[in-house]
Amino acid sequence: MGDASLSVLASSQVVAEGGNNFLVPNGTFFFVLAIFLIVLAVIGTFVVPPVMKVLRERDAMVAKTAADNRKAAEQFEAAQADYEEAMTEARVQASSLRDNARAEGRKVVEDARAKAEQEVLSTLQLAARQLKRERDAVELDLRANVASMSATLASRILGVDVAPAAATTSATKTSGR
C-alpha cells in the first residue's frame, strides 16, 4: 500500500506545480502533427499524381479493350450472318445444280434408251426383211425341188422307182383335198 500512496503523492505534487496537465497539449503533439502534415503533403504532391495517372491510363485501356471486344463481337456476328447467308445460297445453288444434273442425266439416259430402241427396231426390221428374203428363196428352192424330192422319198418308201411327173400329179391330188 505504500507504493500507491507514493504515486498519489507524486501526482498531487505535479498538479500543484502546474506542469503536466493532460487537457493542455504539449509540444510533442504539435511536432508529430507537423511531420504528419509534411509527409501527407509530400505523398499528395509526388506519389498520388503518378499513381492516379497510371490508374486513369489503365481505366482508359480497359475501356478501349471493352470497346474493341464489343466491336469484334459485332464484326463476328456480321461475319457469321454473312457466312450463314453464303452457305444458304451455296446450298440452294448446289441443290439446283444437282437437280439440273439429275434432269440432264435422265435426259441422256432417255435419249440413249430411245436410240437403243430405235437401233433394236431397225435391226429387227432388217432381220425380218432378211429372214423374209431367205424364206422366199428357200420356198422357191423347195417349190422347185419338191417334185424331185417327193419322187425320191416315194421311191425309198415304196421301193419302186417313181417318176417325178407322177409324183407331182399325186402330190397335187393329195394336197388339193
Swiss-Prot record:
Keywords from the UniProt entry: ATP synthesis, Cell membrane, CF(0), Hydrogen ion transport, Ion transport, Membrane, Transmembrane, Transmembrane helix, Transport
Where is this protein found? Cell membrane
Q: Which residues cross the membrane?
A: 29-49
Q: Name one GO molecular function term.
A: proton-transporting ATPase activity, rotational mechanism
Tell me which GO cellular component terms the UniProt record holds.
plasma membrane; proton-transporting ATP synthase complex
This protein's membrane topology, according to the annotation, is: Single-pass membrane protein
The record's InterPro entries line, in alphabetical order, gives:
ATP_synth_B-like_membr_sf, ATP_synth_b/b'su_bac/chlpt, ATP_synthase_B_chain
Family of the protein in this entry: Belongs to the ATPase B chain family.
User: What quaternary structure, including any partners, is listed in this protein's UniProt entry?
Assistant: F-type ATPases have 2 components, F(1) - the catalytic core - and F(0) - the membrane proton channel. F(1) has five subunits: alpha(3), beta(3), gamma(1), delta(1), epsilon(1). F(0) has three main subunits: a(1), b(2) and c(10-14). The alpha and beta chains form an alternating ring which encloses part of the gamma chain. F(1) is attached to F(0) by a central stalk formed by the gamma and epsilon chains, while a peripheral stalk is formed by the delta and b chains.
- What's this protein's function? F(1)F(0) ATP synthase produces ATP from ADP in the presence of a proton or sodium gradient. F-type ATPases consist of two structural domains, F(1) containing the extramembraneous catalytic core and F(0) containing the membrane proton channel, linked together by a central stalk and a peripheral stalk. During catalysis, ATP synthesis in the catalytic domain of F(1) is coupled via a rotary mechanism of the central stalk subunits to proton translocation. Component of the F(0) channel, it forms part of the peripheral stalk, linking F(1) to F(0).
Name of the protein in question: ATP synthase subunit b
Q: Which organism is this entry from? A: Mycolicibacterium paratuberculosis (strain ATCC BAA-968 / K-10)
